[in-house]
UniProtKB/Swiss-Prot annotation:
GO MF annotation list: GTPase activator activity; GTPase regulator activity; protein-containing complex binding
A Pfam family: RhoGAP
Name of the protein in question: Rho GTPase-activating protein SYDE1
Annotated organism of origin: Mus musculus (Mouse)
Phenotype of gene-disrupted mutants: SYDE1 knockout results in small fetuses and aberrant phenotypes in the placental-yolk sac barrier, maternal-trophoblast interface, and placental vascularization. Placental abnormalities include cystic dysplasia and apoptosis in the spongiotrophoblast layer, decreased or absent vascularization in the labyrinthine layer, defective barrier between fetal and maternal blood circulation, and reduced invasiveness of primary trophoblast cells.
Low complexity: compositionally biased ranges: 151-160
Phosphoserine, modified sites: S224, S231, S235, S244, S575, S683, S685
């Protein structure tokens, strides 16, 4: 009778009998959950109830062990009883070991949780005595959580599903963690070393040694794991006590040393020890602080959020920064502002790197922060490099005499000036805005580098540099960066004396007299300035096209060719401010160059302009009006009104000519098919008139404004009016300061 019952019992334990899941597990799992030795059936339910209460598992609907079953087990032979009771595994194997078919669950179900959830909160301390009485005395509890009884098979009677079984496994983690901590030493490192090799704790680092600040230790005298702050630095843990203030040298940047003369190259190791003297306002709550490090205004490193203390905040962070031409190291202390939900600077300090490493490689400084506080840090400079040698100027910034000797250029004029002037005179004399518009900065940088490498190999053709403003910009940059200006101090005084004699007159000075003003200059400067004055005089002769009159040329080149500050021609009675003095000097520069351009002989006047005559403005030749033999009622025109806003460009020359026949106009129907782009753009169409043989008639815009709109009226009439206005506005106005 015993053998069939035993066989049936083991078949249920191993899951070989396929019964309804909820009922079979609730009934059959209660049998092997017994102690390894027979005990009376009465006291064990009480202990089991206490263990279930400690583990926070709801009681089973039916009693796990009845007196009948206990009597049955006692009636068995000792070997059979041990065989029946040996099917239950120890608690350690249930928690740690892999699941086997003898565990009472289906063989094919494997549940794996790589990152367990957080531990549940410990229960109230009232049932602590009953739990300790029912569990084995293995030592004090370090984490402060109430220990639970060893898990048994009866704890799964209410967990038929996999989710419930997984939650029960998660509830066993506090007990497992407690047992592992009791078996190991008290330090975090030994705890990691003695953890089982296959345990989840050691594999996924669930028991971290980095705690939160202010973690209280439990009774028994055992201290909590060593706390620290994780940050961007190399040392996330805080040392024991504050550093000694006497070990750090006070440092504060003086107002006169904020612009150091040199730079620093190398590797800087910065170790932060702490922040002191940051006294919060009375009644203020502690704030989260972080330290931001900047090198020459660029953020390079920062710490994590740190909870500020009453007077001193301990730090232990190390940063390694690569320095390239570094001068200033700035430390910003940022405080969290809950109003705007971001960090705001509350203190800052500056360190001049080139000055602190003179004669040493390491410094321990107490950097003074503004408005309050100190930053205790150690700065170590390693792998210091010498400053790279500055490239020697080959064209820009080189003295004129030295550049001419190096290039051996003909005429004692640098190649860059000859090439730029040649291209401007070839294709830029009729460009509006010459020397006043700026070209592309990137293209200018490319052209500058090309001149620095090899001036003779630079090609300034229109295919390579189509924008003439790039070439004019390079020429002005070169003249501006000369070590000595072309119009020197002696020449400046000579021109001022000539200006004191009266208005420049070619009859009084003559060509040789004006050129004789440059005799005080050296040969190279005299040849270069002569070439530039000839060029500017030629540019001003095309002022009808490029709007570069001698006055405009003097405004553009006066500050470039003359020094920044000249000695005044007569002493002033009283000193003025620096702004007034600079304005007066700037005005004198323009007057000196304007005098030279007006009195300079024009040897290269354009051939289309007669000698001694002023080039006229662009005004179309006045011709008789065109009279068409049209009847009055057959022509419908729309004359332009005198008042009202100007019509848009698309309707500027609008008119209804649909009633006109093809025999009335010489251009025929083609004229009515589209807009007259030739006349709108103001292009020269005199050749077309010569071919057709018809005289080209234009209406005088000034005399016959009320006349009907003429089809041959073009934009040149408007250009003539605009040029007249510009001529009146460009008249010289003498301003006396």
């Amino acid at each position: 009778m015993a053998e069939p019952l035993l066989r049936k019992t083991f078949s249920r334990l191993r899951g070989r009998e396929k019964l309804p899941r909820k009922k079979s597990e609730a009934k059959d799992r209660g049998h092997p959950a017994q102690r390894s030795e027979p005990k009376p059936p009465e006291p064990e339910p009480r202990v089991l109830e206490g263990s279930q209460a400690g583990a926070e598992v709801p009681p089973s609907p039916e009693t796990p062990r009845s007196p009948t079953r206990g009597a049955y087990l006692q009636s068995l032979e000792p070997s059979s009883r041990r065989w029946v009771l040996g099917g239950a595994k120890p608690p350690e194997e249930i928690s740690l070991g892999p699941r086997t078919p003898s565990s009472g669950e289906p063989a094919g179900e494997i549940w794996y949780n790589p990152i367990p959830e957080e531990d549940p909160r410990p229960p109230a301390p009232e049932p602590l005595g009953s739990q300790l009485a029912s569990s084995e005395p293995e030592g004090p509890n370090i984490q402060g959580a109430a220990p639970t009884s060893p898990p048994t098979k009866t704890s799964r009677t209410k967990s038929p599903g996999p989710a419930r079984r997984l939650s029960m496994k998660m509830k066993k983690l506090p007990e497992l963690r407690r047992r592992l901590s009791l078996r190991s030493t008290r330090t975090g490192r030994d705890r990691e070393r003695t953890a089982p090799a296959g345990s989840v704790i050691s594999r996924y680092r669930l028991d971290s040694s980095v705690g939160t600040p202010g973690q209280a230790s439990v009774a028994g005298g055992s201290r909590s794991p060593r706390g620290g702050y994780l940050s961007d630095g190399d040392s996330p843990e805080r040392p024991g006590g504050p550093p000694s203030p006497t070990a750090f040298r006070p440092y504060e940047v003086g107002p006169s040393a904020r612009t150091p003369p040199a730079a620093l190259w190398g590797r800087l190791s910065l170790h932060l020890y702490g922040l002191g003297g940051l006294r919060p306002s009375p009644g203020a709550t502690p704030r989260d602080l972080c330290c931001l490090l900047q090198v020459d205004g660029v953020a390079r490193a920062r710490t994590g959020p740190l909870r500020s203390g009453p007077d001193f905040l301990r730090l232990d962070h190390t940063f390694h920064l690569e320095l390239e031409a570094a001068r200033l190291l700035r430390a910003l202390v940022l405080a969290w502002d809950p109003g705007v939900r971001r960090h705001r600077p509350c203190a800052q300090g500056t360190v001049l790197l080139p000055t602190i490493f003179r004669g040493c490689q390491a410094q321990q400084l107490a950097v003074r922060l503004e408005p309050q506080g100190f930053l205790y840090a150690k700065l170590t400079l390693s792998e210091q490099q010498e400053a790279p040698a500055t490239a020697e100027p080959r064209v820009f910034g080189l003295p004129l005499q030295l550049l001419v000797e190096r290039e051996q250029s003909p005429g004692q004029v640098p190649l860059i000036i000859r090439k730029c002037v040649g291209q401007i005179e070839c294709r830029g004399l009729r460009v509006v805005g010459l020397y006043r518009l700026c070209g592309s900065a990137a293209v200018k940088k490319e052209l500058r580098d090309a001149f620095e490498q090899d001036s003779a190999a630079v090609c300034l053709s229109e295919d390579v540099y189509p924008d003439i403003n790039v070439i004019t910009g390079i020429l002005k940059d070169y003249l501006r960066e000369l070590p000595t200006p072309l119009i020197t101090q002696p020449l400046y005084q000579v021109v001022l004396e000539a200006m004191a004699q009266g208005h420049p007159s070619r009859a009084s000075l003559g060509p040789e007299g004006t050129r004789g003003l440059l005799r005080c200059l050296p040969d190279v400067e005299r040849a270069t300035l002569t070439l530039l004055l000839d060029h500017l005089r030629l540019v001003s002769s095309f002022h009808t096209h490029n709007r570069m009159t001698p006055q405009n040329x003097a405004v553009c080149f006066g500050p470039v060719l003359l020094p920044a500050r000249q000695t005044p021609s007569r002493p002033r009675l009283r000193s003025s401010g620096p702004g007034v003095t600079s304005a007066v000097d700037f005005k004198r520069h323009i007057e000196v160059l304007h005098y030279l351009l007006q009195s300079w002989p024009d040897t290269r006047r354009p051939s289309d302009t007669p000698d001694g005559a002023v080039a006229p403005y662009l005004r179309p030749k006045r011709q008789p009006p065109l009279h068409l033999p049209l009847a009055g009622p057959e022509v419908v025109t729309r004359p332009r009104g005198r008042g009202g806003p100007e019509s848009p460009p698309s309707n500027r020359y609008a008119g209804d000519w649909s009633v006109c026949g093809g025999d009335l106009l010489p251009c025929g129907r083609d004229f009515l098919s589209g807009p007259d782009y030739d006349h709108v753009t103001g292009s020269d169409s005199e050749e077309d008139d010569d071919e057709t043989g018809e005289p080209r008639g234009t209406t005088d815009f000034e005399d016959e404004f009320d006349a009907p709109f003429n089809p041959h009226l073009n934009l040149k009439d408007f250009d003539a009016l605009i040029l007249d206005l510009e001529r009146e506005l460009s008249k010289q106005i003498n301003v006396c300061l």
